[in-house]
Structures are given as structure tokens and as C-alpha cells.
């Protein structure tokens, strides 16, 4: 009897050890992602704070940073992803390829090439959970790879690329699901965000950003035909999740056609809106529209970070949100009321409707807040907001024509010469919106920004310069040219006992007027 008990106890110990060492990262790992030394989610944690509790690099020693290594993919397609890091491996996605690298020395561990016919857009990243790395393909597929080997685990069809549906947003893993979305409303399709089963890619729920028949919001459109191709893409890096309340915060893009509003009279919900869903069911909890009847392609792009502040002795739960209209807003997540709104770029003639002759307006369609979210430092109580200062002339077409799978814009937005553009990195008081400092770049700032407990900020410029700044005053402490434009992820993590900064570069796109360069990642650390 005692022998049997010892055998049973031994088997129990083995089983417990097997569970503890099973596929990772697990849900508890992701829930605590903000406090670890890895980088497990597109914006580091579910709240989207892009804040790392790492202080090996500080304002006192940042000038001593040096490049450690560079991985060059030789892929010159558009590149705008945020890497993930888990236990010494760095995962990186380009338009068609997925890489696992050694997070200390850039050595490639494996590479996977996505099948299918890809369109001209890009991947913003992948989701990592339970031993699977899940990414979207530009022909509407979802692929799960074994995170250790790169071998395919499953594939599923999530979107219809023949209609113009393109999945750009980085997938986000939560519990037994992976959340993805359809962006690029300019093709005249209806945007959506949905969840698929992590185990096999089967659909779980879908929320359509253009209201369906029976939804009271359908009355904000002039006809069901217009709603059928109403836009509302979700295309920026990733939504935020309040894991305590089970809420998913989603930034929804512009209505379609972009510049020809005659065919879509009304406010056009849920476009240019912050939409808050039950993360487990996709049911709408609340929403707030910021650009009713948008006529300037002024997508809402930012749905985080989620953070807390004290105002007049009250503790408020906040969400930062904003978009291509150049305004950064903060809302009380409980009352849904706006606490502050701050212009982080030039705004002139911003509400003037396009005409056939043309109307000059700021920001242009390439201005304001783009695909990367602000960072939040709880230590300094500040938001750090990258933005684009670039105006355009908006023209309405003489007539409108819809062809499935082709651009459906109803006009144009001609950007000013790139020499007239610039970028801003603005530090704001997270409770009041008061500006603490601003850094000006001679080109648009679209790269990710990461804050640390060492009072550092890491980001990059389209000039190709990696920047390390003092988060307290915005002083540039270190600058290094990496050889390609930086419009992508800039993250920090711990490996081998030291803090490392990974800088992705190689943005190749006609929109941002930068030379083509291969998708690359360069690691920086102190000697």
C-alpha cells in the first residue's frame, strides 16, 4: 500500500512538472507581461503601456550604448511590425516571412515563408501563446507555427482578399483565442474584428464595424447599400484589453468612400470611433465617435494605453485615444467622458469638406497619429506621443464609381512636398494633457516609442536614426544610424543579464518618401 502511494505521488509530481513546463507563454505569463523582462505582446502588455520595468540603461550611461548585432532579412517589402521576445528568442514578421532569432546575437534559428498570393500591404506582428506563434497572411489566412521549430501547426481562412479584405493588425492572443481584424477600408469593404480559436483557427466571434440591419446605429447611414461597403477598417498595431473588466478597446478607421460623403449621409457609426467590446463574446459594451461623417481619411488609430491617474483626490481609470486628426484624447473608462484633448500636430482647416477644386487642410491623410500607440510611464505620470505634421489638399471626385477589389475613395488627398513635413514626439501630463516637452524630427515620426523605469525613451526616425532620450526632459542622449528608415517596433528586454534594445528598420513605402531598405533588426546594449 505504501509503495502504491509512493508511486501515485511520484506520478503526480511528474504530471505537475509536465504542466509547469508545458507550452509557453501561458495566460498568466501574458497577464503579467508588463512586469517581466521579455516582450510578449505587441505593445508589451494588454494595457498597451509600452513601459518596461528595466533600468540597466539610464540617462547617466545611455551615451555608452553600442550596436551588438544586426539581422538583415533581404526583404524590401513594407515592414511595420513589433517583435516579440520570449526566453531568449526574438520573433519577427515581414510581409510574407516569419523569423525566430537569438535575442542576444541576432542568429537566425528558423524561418517560415507564408504561402499564398500576397497584396501590397504588410504585417504588424504576431501573437505568441501556448507554444504557438500566430500571424495573418495578406491573402486572408491565419497561420499558427510551432514557436520552437517554425513548423506549421494549422492554417485557416479568415478574410476574403479577392474583395479587398486585408489583415494588417497584429494578432493578439487572449485565453483560448487569437484576435485579428480587417483593415484598409479604402477598398469599399466592411471592417471587422474577430476572435479565432487558438487551438485550430476556428471562428469564435466577429464584430462588424459597420452596423448590421437591426442595429440602431444603422440609421447613421443613408442606405444598406452604402453600409455594405462602408469601410471602418482596423489596421493599427493592436487593440488594448482591460483584463480585469474583460473589455477590448478597438480603434476604428475611416468610412468609405473616403472623400465623397454624398452617398453616405449621416454620422456613419462605428467609423472613426473607439469601440469597446466584451473580449470573450465580441458584444458591444460602449462606443465614442470622434469624427462623425469623416471626409479626410482621419482614422481613429489609437486605443491605448489604459492607465490610472489621480485627479482632485479621485483615482480614475483612463484610456488614451486619438487618430489622424492630430488630437490625443484621454477618456474616463468608467464614465466614458473626455478628460482632456490635446493637439499634437498642426490643425488648420481640419473640418473643411473636400471640393472638386481642392481644399488645403492639416493634418492631411498621412498626418496625425499613425499606427504606433503612445507609451505611458507610471513613474513620471506621462504619455509619450509620436505624431506626423503633414498637410494635404483634399479633392472630391466629379463622380463616384465602385469596382470590387479596387480603391473606393471618391477623390484624393495630395500631400504637401515631403520637405514640408515633420514629426513630433510630445510628452504630456497623463492627468491633464499639459505639454512637458516636445522633440521635433525633420521627417514624420511613426516609429514605436518605449518608456522604461530607468527614465529612458527609445524610438526612431524615418531618417534611419535610433534615438535614446531622457524621458524627463526629452534630451537626446544617444543617436545611431541603422541604415534603414525606422517606422516600426522599438522594444527593450532583458537577456543574458543585461538590458537590450531591439530596433527594427527598413520601411519601404511610397507614402513616406524613404529609400527602400531590407527589413532588419539591430540590437543595442551597454558594453
State the predicted function of each range:
Residues 1-8:
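Bacterial N-terminal signal peptides that target proteins for export
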Residues 16-18:
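C-terminal motif of bacterial Sec signal peptides marking the signal peptidase cleavage site
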Residues 22-73, 107-116, 151-160, 202-211, ...:
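Aromatic (tryptophan-biased) beta-strands that constitute blades/sheets of beta-rich domains
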Residues 39-43, 76-96, 118-142, 166-190, ...:
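Repeat-blade elements of multi-bladed beta-propeller folds
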Residues 98-99, 142, 193, 274, ...:
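Structural signal for beta-propeller blades
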Residues 145, 191-203, 267-282, 422-430, ...:
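Beta-propeller blade signature
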Residues 322-372, 376-407, 479-482, 492-498, ...:
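Beta-propeller fold recognition
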Amino acid at each position: 500500500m505504501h509503495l502504491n502511494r509512493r508511486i501515485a505521488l511520484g506520478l503526480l509530481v511528474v504530471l505537475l512538472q509536465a504542466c509547469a513546463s508545458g507550452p509557453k507563454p501561458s495566460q498568466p505569463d501574458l497577464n503579467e507581461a508588463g512586469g517581466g523582462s521579455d516582450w510578449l505582446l505587441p505593445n508589451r502588455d494588454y494595457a498597451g503601456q509600452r513601459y518596461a520595468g528595466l533600468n540597466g540603461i539610464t540617462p547617466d550611461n545611455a551615451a555608452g550604448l553600442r550596436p551588438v548585432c544586426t539581422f538583415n532579412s533581404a526583404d524590401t517589402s513594407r515592414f511595420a511590425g513589433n517583435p516579440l521576445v520570449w526566453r531568449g528568442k526574438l520573433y519577427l514578421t515581414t510581409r510574407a516571412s516569419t523569423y525566430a532569432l537569438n535575442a542576444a546575437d541576432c542568429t537566425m534559428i528558423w524561418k517560415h515563408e507564408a504561402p499564398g498570393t500576397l497584396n501590397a500591404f504588410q504585417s504588424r506582428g504576431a501573437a505568441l501563446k501556448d507554444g504557438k506563434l500566430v500571424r495573418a497572411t495578406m491573402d486572408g489566412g491565419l497561420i499558427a507555427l510551432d514557436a520552437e521549430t517554425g513548423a506549421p501547426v494549422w492554417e485557416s481562412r479568415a478574410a476574403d482578399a479577392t474583395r479587398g479584405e486585408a489583415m494588417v493588425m497584429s494578432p493578439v492572443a487572449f485565453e483560448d483565442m487569437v484576435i485579428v481584424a480587417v483593415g484598409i477600408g479604402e477598398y469599399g469593404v466592411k471592417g471587422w474584428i474577430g476572435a479565432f480559436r487558438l487551438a485550430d483557427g476556428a471562428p469564435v466571434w466577429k464584430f462588424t464595424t459597420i452596423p448590421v440591419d437591426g442595429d440602431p446605429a444603422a440609421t447613421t447611414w443613408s442606405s444598406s447599400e452604402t453600409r455594405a461597403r462602408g469601410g471602418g477598417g482596423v489596421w493599427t498595431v493592436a487593440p488594448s484589453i482591460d483584463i480585469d473588466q474583460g473589455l477590448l478597446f478597438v480603434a476604428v478607421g475611416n468610412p468609405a468612400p473616403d472623400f465623397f460623403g454624398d452617398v453616405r449621409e449621416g454620422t456613419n457609426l462605428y467609423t472613426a470611433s473607439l469601440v469597446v467590446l466584451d473580449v470573450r463574446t465580441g458584444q458591444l459594451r460602449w462606443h465614442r465617435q470622434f469624427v462623425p461623417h469623416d471626409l479626410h481619411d482621419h482614422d481613429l488609430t489609437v486605443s491605448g494605453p489604459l492607465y490610472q491617474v489621480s485627479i482632485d483626490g479621485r483615482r480614475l481609470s483612463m484610456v488614451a485615444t486619438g487618430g489622424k486628426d492630430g488630437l490625443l484624447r484621454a477618456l474616463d473608462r468608467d464614465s466614458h467622458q473626455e478628460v482632456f484633448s490635446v493637439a499634437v500636430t498642426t490643425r488648420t482647416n481640419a473640418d473643411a469638406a473636400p471640393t472638386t477644386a481642392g481644399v488645403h487642410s492639416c493634418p492631411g491623410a498621412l498626418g496625425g497619429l499613425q499606427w504606433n500607440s503612445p507609451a505611458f510611464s507610471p513613474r513620471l505620470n506621462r504619455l509619450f506621443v509620436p505624431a506626423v505634421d503633414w498637410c494635404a489638399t483634399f479633392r472630391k471626385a466629379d463622380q463616384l464609381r465602385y469596382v470590387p477589389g479596387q480603391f473606393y475613395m471618391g477623390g484624393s488627398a495630395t500631400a504637401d512636398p515631403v520637405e514640408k513635413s515633420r514629426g513630433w514626439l510630445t510628452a504630456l501630463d497623463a492627468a491633464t494633457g499639459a505639454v512637458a516637452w516636445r522633440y521635433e524630427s525633420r521627417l514624420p515620426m511613426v516609429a514605436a516609442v518605449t518608456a522604461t523605469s530607468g527614465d529612458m525613451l527609445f524610438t526612431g526616425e524615418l531618417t534611419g536614426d535610433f534615438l535614446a532620450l531622457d524621458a524627463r526632459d526629452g534630451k537626446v542622449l544617444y543617436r545611431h544610424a541603422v541604415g534603414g528608415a525606422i517606422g516600426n517596433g522599438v522594444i527593450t528586454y532583458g537577456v543574458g543579464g543585461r538590458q537590450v534594445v531591439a530596433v527594427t528598420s527598413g520601411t519601404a513605402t511610397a507614402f513616406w518618401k524613404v529609400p527602400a531598405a531590407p527589413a532588419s533588426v539591430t540590437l543595442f546594449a551597454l558594453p
